[in-house]
Amino acid sequence: MATTGLGLIGRTTLIITVLLALGGCATLRQFGPSVQVASVTPGQYIALKRGDILTSGKLSAATIETLRVAGLDEGVCAKPGLPCIEAMESSIVVREEDKRSSLAELWLQYAMTLPAPKREYSASGRAKTAITELDADFQPRLDAWMQVARQAYAYLFFTERTANQRGFEDRQTQVRDYYNLAVQEASVQLYNAYATGRVHGQASHFQLGRWTFVLAPSDEASALDQRTPSELVPAASLSFTGTLRSVHRRDGFGAELVAVMDDPAGSTATTPPAAAQATQASRPATQSWSEMPSPSMTVLLRFSGKNLWEVLHDDEPELEIHDPYQVAEVTLHGQQVPLAANFTAGYALWLARSNFSRQSLRTLFGGKGGIDTPHLYMMQPYDPNRRVLLMIHGLASSPEAWVNVANELLRDDEIRQEFQVWQFYYPTNMPIAMSHDAMRHTLAEVFKHFDPSGKAQASHDMVLVGHSMGGVIARLMISSSGDHLVDTLLATAQMTPAQRELLRTKGAPVLTFLPEPEVSRVVFIATPHRGTDVAGTRLGRWIGRLVRLPLTVLEDVATIANDGQIDRND
Protein backbone atom coordinates (compact mmCIF):
# COMPACT_ATOMS: atom_id res chain seq x y z
CA MET A 1 0.00 0.00 0.00
CA ALA A 2 2.77 2.37 0.84
CA THR A 3 4.40 1.70 -2.50
CA THR A 4 1.16 2.10 -4.34
CA GLY A 5 0.39 5.32 -2.52
CA LEU A 6 3.88 6.64 -3.23
CA GLY A 7 3.49 5.78 -6.89
CA LEU A 8 0.20 7.65 -7.14
CA ILE A 9 1.70 10.68 -5.47
CA GLY A 10 4.65 10.53 -7.85
CA ARG A 11 2.46 10.35 -10.94
CA THR A 12 0.35 13.26 -9.71
CA THR A 13 3.46 15.31 -9.06
CA LEU A 14 4.77 14.47 -12.53
CA ILE A 15 1.53 15.58 -14.23
CA ILE A 16 1.48 18.85 -12.31
CA THR A 17 5.12 19.47 -13.19
CA VAL A 18 4.45 18.86 -16.90
CA LEU A 19 1.42 21.14 -16.87
CA LEU A 20 3.41 23.90 -15.20
CA ALA A 21 6.22 23.43 -17.73
CA LEU A 22 3.76 23.78 -20.58
CA GLY A 23 2.13 26.84 -19.07
CA GLY A 24 3.28 29.00 -22.03
CA CYS A 25 1.30 26.92 -24.52
CA ALA A 26 -1.85 28.79 -25.48
CA THR A 27 -3.91 25.63 -25.90
CA LEU A 28 -3.13 24.25 -22.48
CA ARG A 29 -3.19 27.65 -20.84
CA GLN A 30 -6.64 28.55 -22.14
CA PHE A 31 -8.06 25.03 -22.25
CA GLY A 32 -9.99 26.11 -25.38
CA PRO A 33 -9.92 25.79 -29.18
CA SER A 34 -6.94 27.17 -31.06
CA VAL A 35 -9.26 29.00 -33.48
CA GLN A 36 -12.15 31.11 -32.33
CA VAL A 37 -14.91 32.76 -34.35
CA ALA A 38 -16.75 36.06 -34.03
CA SER A 39 -19.43 37.75 -36.11
CA VAL A 40 -18.82 40.89 -38.18
CA THR A 41 -21.32 43.06 -39.99
CA PRO A 42 -21.24 43.36 -43.79
CA GLY A 43 -19.91 46.88 -43.41
CA GLN A 44 -17.07 45.72 -41.19
CA TYR A 45 -16.23 42.94 -43.63
CA ILE A 46 -16.06 45.32 -46.59
CA ALA A 47 -14.03 47.85 -44.58
CA LEU A 48 -11.55 45.14 -43.57
CA LYS A 49 -11.34 43.81 -47.12
CA ARG A 50 -11.06 47.12 -48.97
CA GLY A 51 -9.57 49.44 -46.40
CA ASP A 52 -6.03 50.67 -47.07
CA ILE A 53 -3.64 53.52 -46.36
CA LEU A 54 -5.75 55.91 -48.45
CA THR A 55 -9.19 55.12 -47.06
CA SER A 56 -8.47 54.27 -43.43
CA GLY A 57 -4.99 55.62 -42.80
CA LYS A 58 -3.80 52.08 -42.07
CA LEU A 59 -2.09 49.49 -44.23
CA SER A 60 -4.41 47.15 -46.10
CA ALA A 61 -5.03 43.59 -44.96
CA ALA A 62 -3.16 42.36 -48.05
CA THR A 63 0.00 44.29 -47.18
CA ILE A 64 -0.15 43.27 -43.52
CA GLU A 65 -0.47 39.62 -44.57
CA THR A 66 2.51 39.97 -46.92
CA LEU A 67 4.58 41.46 -44.09
CA ARG A 68 3.66 38.49 -41.90
CA VAL A 69 4.63 35.98 -44.58
CA ALA A 70 7.96 37.77 -44.97
CA GLY A 71 8.42 37.82 -41.19
CA LEU A 72 8.52 41.61 -41.16
CA ASP A 73 5.33 42.45 -39.28
CA GLU A 74 7.37 42.92 -36.12
CA GLY A 75 10.77 44.47 -35.72
CA VAL A 76 11.94 46.41 -38.76
CA CYS A 77 8.39 47.06 -40.03
CA ALA A 78 6.90 47.97 -36.67
CA LYS A 79 7.20 51.57 -37.85
CA PRO A 80 6.81 52.83 -41.44
CA GLY A 81 9.95 53.99 -43.17
CA LEU A 82 12.75 53.18 -45.57
CA PRO A 83 14.19 50.27 -43.50
CA CYS A 84 10.89 48.41 -43.80
CA ILE A 85 10.74 49.10 -47.55
CA GLU A 86 14.31 47.87 -48.04
CA ALA A 87 13.61 44.72 -46.03
CA MET A 88 10.53 43.94 -48.11
CA GLU A 89 12.46 44.54 -51.33
CA SER A 90 15.10 42.00 -50.29
CA SER A 91 12.59 39.35 -49.18
CA ILE A 92 12.64 36.12 -51.23
CA VAL A 93 9.70 34.30 -49.63
CA VAL A 94 6.79 36.26 -51.14
CA ARG A 95 5.41 36.28 -54.68
CA GLU A 96 6.37 39.22 -56.91
CA GLU A 97 2.72 40.18 -57.25
CA ASP A 98 2.29 40.47 -53.49
CA LYS A 99 5.68 42.14 -53.09
CA ARG A 100 5.08 44.86 -55.70
CA SER A 101 1.58 45.70 -54.50
CA SER A 102 2.80 45.87 -50.90
CA LEU A 103 5.82 47.99 -51.83
CA ALA A 104 3.56 50.40 -53.69
CA GLU A 105 1.49 50.85 -50.53
CA LEU A 106 4.55 51.06 -48.26
CA TRP A 107 6.09 53.75 -50.48
CA LEU A 108 2.74 55.54 -50.45
CA GLN A 109 2.67 55.40 -46.66
CA TYR A 110 6.17 56.84 -46.57
CA ALA A 111 5.35 59.59 -49.10
CA MET A 112 2.37 60.66 -47.02
CA THR A 113 4.59 61.12 -43.96
CA LEU A 114 6.84 63.64 -45.73
CA PRO A 115 5.97 67.32 -45.20
CA ALA A 116 4.17 68.84 -48.18
CA PRO A 117 3.01 72.38 -49.00
CA LYS A 118 -0.66 72.68 -48.20
CA ARG A 119 -2.84 73.43 -51.20
CA GLU A 120 -5.57 75.88 -50.27
CA TYR A 121 -8.17 77.20 -52.68
CA SER A 122 -10.59 80.06 -52.33
CA ALA A 123 -14.33 79.74 -53.01
CA SER A 124 -13.62 80.54 -56.65
CA GLY A 125 -11.10 77.70 -56.86
CA ARG A 126 -8.01 79.90 -57.07
CA ALA A 127 -4.88 78.99 -55.16
CA LYS A 128 -4.51 81.32 -52.18
CA THR A 129 -0.73 81.35 -52.39
CA ALA A 130 1.47 81.12 -55.46
CA ILE A 131 4.50 78.83 -55.45
CA THR A 132 7.65 80.91 -55.76
CA GLU A 133 10.26 78.40 -54.60
CA LEU A 134 10.52 74.70 -53.79
CA ASP A 135 10.68 73.46 -50.20
CA ALA A 136 13.54 71.41 -48.76
CA ASP A 137 11.58 68.14 -48.88
CA PHE A 138 10.70 68.52 -52.55
CA GLN A 139 13.18 65.98 -53.95
CA PRO A 140 12.60 63.22 -51.33
CA ARG A 141 8.86 63.66 -51.81
CA LEU A 142 9.16 63.43 -55.60
CA ASP A 143 11.36 60.32 -55.27
CA ALA A 144 8.80 58.66 -53.01
CA TRP A 145 5.86 59.37 -55.33
CA MET A 146 7.82 58.13 -58.33
CA GLN A 147 8.61 54.92 -56.46
CA VAL A 148 4.90 54.47 -55.76
CA ALA A 149 4.12 54.89 -59.46
CA ARG A 150 6.89 52.54 -60.56
CA GLN A 151 6.05 49.77 -58.08
CA ALA A 152 2.35 50.00 -58.95
CA TYR A 153 3.16 49.96 -62.67
CA ALA A 154 5.33 46.87 -62.19
CA TYR A 155 2.53 45.11 -60.29
CA LEU A 156 -0.07 45.93 -62.93
CA PHE A 157 1.91 44.91 -66.01
CA PHE A 158 5.00 42.86 -65.05
CA THR A 159 4.01 40.25 -62.47
CA GLU A 160 2.72 36.68 -62.72
CA ARG A 161 -0.79 37.57 -63.92
CA THR A 162 -2.08 40.16 -66.38
CA ALA A 163 -4.35 43.04 -65.42
CA ASN A 164 -7.24 41.31 -67.20
CA GLN A 165 -6.79 38.17 -65.12
CA ARG A 166 -7.06 40.27 -61.94
CA GLY A 167 -9.95 42.30 -63.33
CA PHE A 168 -12.40 41.79 -60.44
CA GLU A 169 -9.90 41.88 -57.59
CA ASP A 170 -10.09 44.68 -55.05
CA ARG A 171 -6.31 44.66 -54.73
CA GLN A 172 -5.83 45.70 -58.34
CA THR A 173 -8.24 48.61 -57.86
CA GLN A 174 -6.26 49.71 -54.80
CA VAL A 175 -2.93 49.60 -56.63
CA ARG A 176 -4.39 51.42 -59.63
CA ASP A 177 -5.47 54.19 -57.25
CA TYR A 178 -1.93 54.30 -55.84
CA TYR A 179 -0.56 54.75 -59.35
CA ASN A 180 -3.07 57.46 -60.28
CA LEU A 181 -2.40 59.41 -57.08
CA ALA A 182 1.36 59.09 -57.50
CA VAL A 183 1.21 60.35 -61.09
CA GLN A 184 -1.00 63.23 -59.96
CA GLU A 185 1.41 64.29 -57.22
CA ALA A 186 4.49 63.83 -59.40
CA SER A 187 2.91 65.85 -62.23
CA VAL A 188 2.04 68.74 -59.93
CA GLN A 189 5.54 68.71 -58.44
CA LEU A 190 7.09 68.63 -61.91
CA TYR A 191 4.97 71.61 -62.92
CA ASN A 192 5.95 73.50 -59.76
CA ALA A 193 9.61 72.79 -60.46
CA TYR A 194 9.19 74.00 -64.03
CA ALA A 195 7.41 77.16 -62.85
CA THR A 196 10.25 77.95 -60.43
CA GLY A 197 13.03 77.26 -62.93
CA ARG A 198 14.30 74.08 -61.25
CA VAL A 199 13.83 71.81 -64.27
CA HIS A 200 16.83 71.24 -66.54
CA GLY A 201 17.04 69.78 -70.01
CA GLN A 202 15.59 70.20 -73.48
CA ALA A 203 12.04 70.97 -74.52
CA SER A 204 11.01 67.29 -74.54
CA HIS A 205 13.30 66.06 -71.72
CA PHE A 206 12.95 67.36 -68.16
CA GLN A 207 15.56 66.37 -65.60
CA LEU A 208 14.78 66.62 -61.93
CA GLY A 209 17.16 64.88 -59.55
CA ARG A 210 17.59 61.24 -60.55
CA TRP A 211 14.54 61.35 -62.83
CA THR A 212 14.40 62.34 -66.49
CA PHE A 213 10.88 62.83 -67.83
CA VAL A 214 10.52 62.28 -71.57
CA LEU A 215 7.54 64.20 -72.97
CA ALA A 216 5.64 61.94 -75.38
CA PRO A 217 4.19 63.31 -78.65
CA SER A 218 0.62 64.56 -78.32
CA ASP A 219 -2.32 62.50 -79.52
CA GLU A 220 -2.79 62.67 -83.28
CA ALA A 221 -6.36 63.95 -82.94
CA SER A 222 -5.72 66.12 -79.90
CA ALA A 223 -5.84 69.90 -80.08
CA LEU A 224 -5.04 70.62 -76.44
CA ASP A 225 -3.71 74.10 -75.82
CA GLN A 226 0.08 73.96 -76.12
CA ARG A 227 0.65 77.00 -73.92
CA THR A 228 2.16 76.63 -70.47
CA PRO A 229 -0.67 76.68 -67.92
CA SER A 230 -0.72 79.26 -65.17
CA GLU A 231 -1.89 76.54 -62.76
CA LEU A 232 -2.09 72.76 -62.72
CA VAL A 233 -4.92 71.67 -60.44
CA PRO A 234 -5.68 68.04 -59.45
CA ALA A 235 -9.32 67.36 -60.21
CA ALA A 236 -9.52 65.18 -57.10
CA SER A 237 -8.66 68.18 -54.91
CA LEU A 238 -11.75 70.14 -56.00
CA SER A 239 -15.20 69.94 -54.45
CA PHE A 240 -18.09 71.83 -56.03
CA THR A 241 -21.26 73.14 -54.44
CA GLY A 242 -24.05 75.42 -55.61
CA THR A 243 -26.30 74.63 -58.56
CA LEU A 244 -24.02 71.95 -60.04
CA ARG A 245 -25.86 68.68 -59.48
CA SER A 246 -23.21 66.06 -60.22
CA VAL A 247 -19.59 65.41 -61.15
CA HIS A 248 -19.07 63.04 -64.07
CA ARG A 249 -15.97 60.88 -64.37
CA ARG A 250 -14.65 57.84 -66.15
CA ASP A 251 -12.77 55.34 -64.00
CA GLY A 252 -9.49 54.22 -65.45
CA PHE A 253 -5.76 54.70 -65.63
CA GLY A 254 -4.04 58.06 -65.17
CA ALA A 255 -4.12 61.29 -63.18
CA GLU A 256 -7.08 63.62 -63.75
CA LEU A 257 -5.84 67.22 -63.91
CA VAL A 258 -7.09 70.66 -64.92
CA ALA A 259 -4.70 72.96 -66.78
CA VAL A 260 -5.68 76.55 -66.04
CA MET A 261 -4.72 78.93 -68.84
CA ASP A 262 -4.84 82.70 -68.99
CA ASP A 263 -8.30 83.55 -70.32
CA PRO A 264 -7.99 85.85 -73.36
CA ALA A 265 -11.63 86.78 -72.94
CA GLY A 266 -11.12 87.63 -69.29
CA SER A 267 -9.53 90.92 -70.28
CA THR A 268 -10.96 91.44 -73.74
CA ALA A 269 -14.63 90.73 -73.23
CA THR A 270 -14.78 92.84 -70.11
CA THR A 271 -14.64 96.59 -70.45
CA PRO A 272 -12.14 97.90 -67.87
CA PRO A 273 -13.07 101.09 -66.02
CA ALA A 274 -9.97 102.86 -67.36
CA ALA A 275 -11.22 102.32 -70.90
CA ALA A 276 -14.67 103.65 -70.23
CA GLN A 277 -13.95 106.84 -72.19
CA ALA A 278 -12.33 105.10 -75.15
CA THR A 279 -13.69 105.84 -78.59
CA GLN A 280 -14.47 103.42 -81.37
CA ALA A 281 -11.30 104.39 -83.22
CA SER A 282 -9.03 103.76 -80.23
CA ARG A 283 -10.70 100.58 -78.96
CA PRO A 284 -8.39 97.63 -79.81
CA ALA A 285 -9.66 94.77 -81.90
CA THR A 286 -9.99 91.58 -79.88
CA GLN A 287 -10.53 87.95 -80.76
CA SER A 288 -14.20 87.16 -80.32
CA TRP A 289 -13.75 83.44 -79.60
CA SER A 290 -11.54 81.22 -77.47
CA GLU A 291 -11.34 77.79 -75.90
CA MET A 292 -12.53 77.34 -72.34
CA PRO A 293 -9.45 78.37 -70.30
CA SER A 294 -9.43 75.34 -68.00
CA PRO A 295 -9.30 72.18 -70.11
CA SER A 296 -9.28 68.77 -68.49
CA MET A 297 -6.43 66.39 -69.20
CA THR A 298 -5.23 62.96 -68.13
CA VAL A 299 -1.54 62.28 -67.48
CA LEU A 300 0.26 58.93 -67.58
CA LEU A 301 3.78 57.85 -66.67
CA ARG A 302 4.93 54.95 -68.84
CA PHE A 303 7.94 53.00 -67.53
CA SER A 304 9.98 51.16 -70.15
CA GLY A 305 11.47 47.70 -69.98
CA LYS A 306 11.18 44.19 -71.37
CA ASN A 307 11.01 42.59 -67.95
CA LEU A 308 10.41 43.37 -64.31
CA TRP A 309 14.05 44.14 -63.51
CA GLU A 310 14.34 46.70 -66.32
CA VAL A 311 11.10 48.42 -65.32
CA LEU A 312 12.21 48.69 -61.69
CA HIS A 313 15.43 50.41 -62.83
CA ASP A 314 13.88 52.80 -65.37
CA ASP A 315 14.55 56.38 -64.22
CA GLU A 316 13.44 57.91 -67.54
CA PRO A 317 9.67 57.42 -67.70
CA GLU A 318 7.66 58.73 -70.61
CA LEU A 319 5.22 61.50 -69.67
CA GLU A 320 2.00 61.27 -71.69
CA ILE A 321 -0.65 64.01 -71.74
CA HIS A 322 -4.00 62.94 -73.17
CA ASP A 323 -7.21 64.75 -74.06
CA PRO A 324 -9.92 62.61 -72.39
CA TYR A 325 -12.51 63.87 -74.89
CA GLN A 326 -10.47 62.38 -77.72
CA VAL A 327 -8.94 59.30 -76.10
CA ALA A 328 -10.93 56.71 -74.15
CA GLU A 329 -8.38 53.87 -74.06
CA VAL A 330 -4.62 53.46 -74.18
CA THR A 331 -2.42 50.46 -74.87
CA LEU A 332 0.13 49.65 -72.18
CA HIS A 333 2.42 46.69 -72.81
CA GLY A 334 -0.06 45.01 -75.10
CA GLN A 335 -3.07 45.53 -72.84
CA GLN A 336 -5.98 47.88 -73.54
CA VAL A 337 -6.85 49.90 -70.44
CA PRO A 338 -9.46 52.65 -70.01
CA LEU A 339 -8.15 56.18 -69.64
CA ALA A 340 -9.34 57.97 -66.51
CA ALA A 341 -11.22 61.21 -67.11
CA ASN A 342 -13.04 63.97 -65.26
CA PHE A 343 -15.54 65.67 -67.56
CA THR A 344 -16.85 68.15 -64.99
CA ALA A 345 -13.85 69.57 -63.11
CA GLY A 346 -12.49 71.88 -65.83
CA TYR A 347 -15.92 73.21 -66.78
CA ALA A 348 -17.03 73.72 -63.17
CA LEU A 349 -13.74 75.40 -62.21
CA TRP A 350 -14.14 77.83 -65.13
CA LEU A 351 -17.67 78.74 -64.03
CA ALA A 352 -16.61 79.07 -60.37
CA ARG A 353 -13.90 81.57 -61.30
CA SER A 354 -15.79 83.47 -63.98
CA ASN A 355 -18.14 85.53 -61.82
CA PHE A 356 -20.58 85.39 -64.74
CA SER A 357 -23.72 85.84 -62.63
CA ARG A 358 -22.72 89.27 -61.29
CA GLN A 359 -21.10 90.30 -64.53
CA SER A 360 -24.25 89.61 -66.54
CA LEU A 361 -26.32 91.84 -64.24
CA ARG A 362 -23.72 94.62 -64.35
CA THR A 363 -23.82 94.34 -68.12
CA LEU A 364 -27.62 94.58 -68.28
CA PHE A 365 -27.76 97.73 -66.18
CA GLY A 366 -24.67 99.36 -67.66
CA GLY A 367 -22.42 98.94 -64.63
CA LYS A 368 -18.64 98.78 -64.63
CA GLY A 369 -17.06 95.43 -65.28
CA GLY A 370 -19.70 94.23 -67.73
CA ILE A 371 -19.10 93.00 -71.28
CA ASP A 372 -19.77 94.93 -74.46
CA THR A 373 -19.40 92.35 -77.24
CA PRO A 374 -20.41 88.70 -77.69
CA HIS A 375 -17.77 86.06 -77.08
CA LEU A 376 -17.78 82.43 -78.19
CA TYR A 377 -16.40 79.81 -75.79
CA MET A 378 -15.47 76.32 -76.96
CA MET A 379 -15.93 73.82 -74.15
CA GLN A 380 -13.26 71.55 -75.69
CA PRO A 381 -10.45 72.10 -78.17
CA TYR A 382 -11.76 72.35 -81.73
CA ASP A 383 -12.38 68.98 -83.37
CA PRO A 384 -12.98 68.99 -87.15
CA ASN A 385 -14.69 65.59 -86.98
CA ARG A 386 -17.45 66.44 -84.52
CA ARG A 387 -20.58 68.50 -85.10
CA VAL A 388 -21.12 71.72 -83.15
CA LEU A 389 -23.80 72.11 -80.51
CA LEU A 390 -24.07 75.87 -79.94
CA MET A 391 -25.87 77.19 -76.85
CA ILE A 392 -27.16 80.79 -76.54
CA HIS A 393 -28.38 82.00 -73.14
CA GLY A 394 -31.22 84.39 -72.39
CA LEU A 395 -31.84 87.84 -70.93
CA ALA A 396 -29.67 88.92 -67.96
CA SER A 397 -27.98 85.54 -68.11
CA SER A 398 -24.63 83.97 -68.97
CA PRO A 399 -23.07 80.54 -69.63
CA GLU A 400 -23.96 79.69 -66.03
CA ALA A 401 -27.52 79.14 -67.24
CA TRP A 402 -26.33 75.97 -68.95
CA VAL A 403 -24.30 74.59 -66.04
CA ASN A 404 -26.22 71.32 -65.61
CA VAL A 405 -27.34 70.99 -69.23
CA ALA A 406 -23.78 71.27 -70.54
CA ASN A 407 -22.46 69.06 -67.75
CA GLU A 408 -24.91 66.28 -68.64
CA LEU A 409 -24.10 66.62 -72.34
CA LEU A 410 -20.38 66.33 -71.67
CA ARG A 411 -20.82 63.11 -69.69
CA ASP A 412 -22.86 61.28 -72.34
CA ASP A 413 -20.55 59.04 -74.39
CA GLU A 414 -22.62 59.10 -77.58
CA ILE A 415 -23.16 62.87 -77.52
CA ARG A 416 -19.53 63.49 -76.63
CA GLN A 417 -18.36 61.37 -79.55
CA GLU A 418 -20.70 63.13 -81.98
CA PHE A 419 -20.72 66.76 -80.78
CA GLN A 420 -18.49 69.49 -79.40
CA VAL A 421 -20.21 72.06 -77.19
CA TRP A 422 -19.85 75.80 -77.82
CA GLN A 423 -21.47 78.64 -75.87
CA PHE A 424 -22.06 82.27 -76.73
CA TYR A 425 -21.73 84.83 -73.95
CA TYR A 426 -23.17 88.16 -75.02
CA PRO A 427 -24.34 91.46 -73.47
CA THR A 428 -28.11 91.17 -73.17
CA ASN A 429 -28.50 94.94 -73.02
CA MET A 430 -27.38 95.10 -76.64
CA PRO A 431 -30.16 95.28 -79.26
CA ILE A 432 -31.02 91.80 -80.52
CA ALA A 433 -30.27 92.75 -84.12
CA MET A 434 -26.74 93.82 -83.20
CA SER A 435 -26.08 90.72 -81.05
CA HIS A 436 -27.33 88.53 -83.87
CA ASP A 437 -25.10 90.27 -86.41
CA ALA A 438 -22.04 90.05 -84.13
CA MET A 439 -22.61 86.34 -83.53
CA ARG A 440 -22.84 85.65 -87.25
CA HIS A 441 -19.53 87.43 -87.81
CA THR A 442 -17.91 85.49 -84.95
CA LEU A 443 -19.02 82.14 -86.35
CA ALA A 444 -17.70 83.14 -89.76
CA GLU A 445 -14.32 84.00 -88.21
CA VAL A 446 -14.13 80.69 -86.33
CA PHE A 447 -14.92 78.52 -89.34
CA LYS A 448 -12.61 80.53 -91.56
CA HIS A 449 -9.81 80.05 -89.03
CA PHE A 450 -10.24 76.31 -88.45
CA ASP A 451 -11.79 75.14 -91.72
CA PRO A 452 -11.18 77.55 -94.62
CA SER A 453 -12.34 74.98 -97.17
CA GLY A 454 -15.58 74.29 -95.29
CA LYS A 455 -15.23 70.53 -95.74
CA ALA A 456 -14.90 69.46 -92.10
CA GLN A 457 -17.81 67.80 -90.31
CA ALA A 458 -17.71 70.62 -87.74
CA SER A 459 -18.76 73.09 -90.45
CA HIS A 460 -21.98 71.21 -91.17
CA ASP A 461 -25.17 70.14 -89.38
CA MET A 462 -24.77 72.49 -86.41
CA VAL A 463 -27.43 72.30 -83.70
CA LEU A 464 -28.49 75.57 -82.03
CA VAL A 465 -30.01 75.59 -78.55
CA GLY A 466 -31.50 78.93 -77.51
CA HIS A 467 -33.13 79.91 -74.24
CA SER A 468 -35.47 82.92 -74.01
CA MET A 469 -33.78 85.83 -75.82
CA GLY A 470 -31.15 83.38 -77.02
CA GLY A 471 -33.93 81.46 -78.77
CA VAL A 472 -34.98 84.62 -80.60
CA ILE A 473 -31.41 85.09 -81.81
CA ALA A 474 -31.23 81.42 -82.82
CA ARG A 475 -34.39 81.86 -84.88
CA LEU A 476 -32.88 84.84 -86.68
CA MET A 477 -29.87 82.69 -87.56
CA ILE A 478 -32.06 80.31 -89.57
CA SER A 479 -34.26 83.04 -91.06
CA SER A 480 -34.16 85.03 -94.28
CA SER A 481 -35.00 88.72 -93.94
CA GLY A 482 -34.79 89.80 -97.57
CA ASP A 483 -35.44 93.54 -97.66
CA HIS A 484 -38.44 93.23 -95.36
CA LEU A 485 -36.92 94.77 -92.23
CA VAL A 486 -35.34 97.71 -94.04
CA ASP A 487 -38.46 98.37 -96.12
CA THR A 488 -40.70 98.20 -93.03
CA LEU A 489 -38.57 100.75 -91.20
CA LEU A 490 -38.51 103.06 -94.19
CA ALA A 491 -42.28 102.82 -94.52
CA THR A 492 -43.27 103.21 -90.87
CA ALA A 493 -40.60 105.33 -89.18
CA GLN A 494 -40.48 109.09 -89.47
CA MET A 495 -36.97 109.87 -90.66
CA THR A 496 -35.19 112.68 -92.41
CA PRO A 497 -33.71 112.04 -95.87
CA ALA A 498 -30.26 111.80 -94.30
CA GLN A 499 -31.49 109.20 -91.81
CA ARG A 500 -33.11 107.17 -94.60
CA GLU A 501 -29.89 107.14 -96.56
CA LEU A 502 -27.96 106.17 -93.45
CA LEU A 503 -30.37 103.28 -92.82
CA ARG A 504 -29.84 101.97 -96.34
CA THR A 505 -26.04 102.18 -96.15
CA LYS A 506 -25.23 101.43 -92.51
CA GLY A 507 -28.29 99.55 -91.29
CA ALA A 508 -28.83 97.20 -94.21
CA PRO A 509 -25.89 94.89 -93.37
CA VAL A 510 -27.32 94.35 -89.88
CA LEU A 511 -30.96 94.02 -90.94
CA THR A 512 -30.45 91.89 -94.05
CA PHE A 513 -29.45 88.25 -93.64
CA LEU A 514 -29.87 84.70 -94.90
CA PRO A 515 -30.06 81.39 -92.97
CA GLU A 516 -26.71 80.22 -91.62
CA PRO A 517 -25.68 77.35 -93.91
CA GLU A 518 -23.92 75.46 -91.09
CA VAL A 519 -27.13 75.08 -89.03
CA SER A 520 -29.38 72.06 -89.55
CA ARG A 521 -31.47 72.02 -86.36
CA VAL A 522 -32.63 74.42 -83.65
CA VAL A 523 -33.96 73.70 -80.16
CA PHE A 524 -36.02 76.50 -78.59
CA ILE A 525 -36.43 76.68 -74.80
CA ALA A 526 -39.01 79.15 -73.39
CA THR A 527 -38.53 81.41 -76.41
CA PRO A 528 -41.04 84.32 -76.78
CA HIS A 529 -41.49 84.05 -80.56
CA ARG A 530 -44.47 86.43 -80.38
CA GLY A 531 -42.99 88.70 -77.74
CA THR A 532 -44.04 88.82 -74.11
CA ASP A 533 -46.90 90.62 -72.36
CA VAL A 534 -44.62 91.32 -69.41
CA ALA A 535 -42.69 93.90 -71.44
CA GLY A 536 -45.79 96.09 -71.68
CA THR A 537 -46.64 96.06 -67.99
CA ARG A 538 -45.67 98.77 -65.53
CA LEU A 539 -43.00 96.49 -64.04
CA GLY A 540 -41.63 95.68 -67.49
CA ARG A 541 -41.42 99.35 -68.46
CA TRP A 542 -39.77 100.23 -65.15
CA ILE A 543 -37.11 97.53 -65.61
CA GLY A 544 -36.66 98.61 -69.21
CA ARG A 545 -35.75 102.12 -68.08
CA LEU A 546 -32.96 100.64 -65.93
CA VAL A 547 -31.34 98.87 -68.86
CA ARG A 548 -28.44 100.75 -70.42
CA LEU A 549 -26.96 100.21 -73.86
CA PRO A 550 -23.31 99.12 -73.96
CA LEU A 551 -20.80 101.92 -74.30
CA THR A 552 -19.58 100.44 -77.57
CA VAL A 553 -23.07 100.64 -79.07
CA LEU A 554 -23.41 104.29 -78.10
CA GLU A 555 -19.99 105.00 -79.61
CA ASP A 556 -20.94 103.19 -82.82
CA VAL A 557 -24.17 105.19 -83.09
CA ALA A 558 -22.27 108.42 -82.47
CA THR A 559 -19.73 107.51 -85.15
CA ILE A 560 -22.46 106.69 -87.66
CA ALA A 561 -24.24 109.94 -86.84
CA ASN A 562 -21.05 111.90 -87.41
CA ASP A 563 -20.39 110.08 -90.69
CA GLY A 564 -23.91 110.83 -91.86
CA GLN A 565 -23.77 114.41 -90.62
CA ILE A 566 -26.85 113.85 -88.48
CA ASP A 567 -27.61 115.78 -85.34
CA ARG A 568 -27.41 113.42 -82.36
CA ASN A 569 -30.75 114.76 -81.13
CA ASP A 570 -32.36 113.28 -84.23
Model-predicted regions and their roles:
Residues 25-389, 398-404, 420-423:
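Flexible, membrane-associating and regulatory peripheral segments of lipid-active enzymes
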Residues 2-14:
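Bacterial N-terminal signal peptides that target proteins for export
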Residues 372-375, 406, 436, 440-443:
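Short, well-ordered alpha-helical scaffold segments within catalytic/effector domains
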Residues 112, 116-187, 191, 196, ...:
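Serine-dependent carboxylesterase/thioesterase catalytic core
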Residues 12-23:
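Bacterial N-terminal signal peptides
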Residues 382-384, 414-415, 457:
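Intrinsically disordered, low-complexity regulatory regions enriched in Ser/Pro/Gly/Thr
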Residues 403-419:
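Short amphipathic alpha-helix adjacent to the substrate-entry channel of hydrolases
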